[in-house]
Amino acid sequence: GGWGWTDLSGAVPDADDTPGALLALSNLMQSGRLSDSQKERVKRASDLGVNWIMKLQNRDDGWPTFCRGWGKLPFDRSGADITAHCMRGIHAWQEHHPQRHRIQQAIRRGLRYLEKTQAEDGSWLPLWFGNQDNPGEENPVYGTSKVLAAYAALNLLETQPAQRGLRWIR
C-alpha cells in the first residue's frame, strides 16, 4: 500500500513518499481529467496508501519513516515533519475513505504528537533534511514549515501550536 522513493522495483515504502503520492493522486482526482475507470483505480490505490500509513503510526502518536515501533534507528523514531506529512496525505482522502473515523482519530493523535514535540520557541525539528550550517545540523525552518502546512490543510492555523509556530517562523 505504500510508495517508496524510487520507481525501481524493490523500493521500500516510506512515510515521506507515500503521503506525497497520496497528495498527488488527490490533485489528479480533482483535476477532472480522469475517466470513471481511472478514478476507481486511483481510489483503490489511495485506500491502500491511507491504510498503510495508518498502520505505521507509532504508540507515541507520531509517524516514523519506515518501521512502526522500532525506535532504535534514527529514521524509525517518530518525527514532526513525517507526522505532519502523513496527516496531510490521509486528510486529503478522508472524505473518500470507507473508515473516515479512523483517519480522524489518527489525525487527532498526530496533533497530540506535534503539540508534545513543539520546542519552547514554537519551532519543530524535522527527522530529515538537516542543515549543515546550523549547530547540531538541525533544520527548524524545514520542520516548522512542514508542520504548518499540515495545520493549514486541516484549517487549524488559529490554534495555539500553529500560532506559536507562525510567530517563530516570521
Task: Indicate residue ranges for each PLM-predicted region.
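An alpha-helical repeat/solenoid feature that recognizes helix-turn-helix modules
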Residues: 1-112, 116-170
